[in-house]
Amino acid sequence: MPDLAFRLPATPGSIALARHELDRLAGEVDAEQLDVLRLLVSETVSNSVRHAGAAEVIDIRLWLGRRSIRLEVEDRGPGFRPRRVSRTNGGWGLVIVERLARRWGGRSGRPTTVWLELDRQPSTA
């Protein structure tokens, strides 16, 4: 079971809402790592909003392991080819994910899921 899970409408306002939901992790996750998670959730939710369609929803799930953090963002959009992502495809979103995450990937189709993992940093809170 995820440590944090929530569902948002696939609308532009959900990008900020998703970042705000991560505030629940303050004290459990290192402050700098929480900032990285906010950036990563912004980029992945932005992609979902762009591709899922306004009538759809986005599911966000996060697991806090002893050594890693896993984030999944799922939508009902048309999917994509995870390893063929580049800046020329319309944005920096998955390029940023690739640079900041230890590992990442996705499952294309309906639903489409982007997942990523970070090495967990000790909390300083």
Language-model features and meaning:
Residues R19-S42:
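Conserved short strand/loop->alpha-helix "switch" segment adjacent to the catalytic nucleotide/phosphoryl-transfer site
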Residues R7-T11, D30, V85-R87:
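Alpha-helix initiation/capping motif
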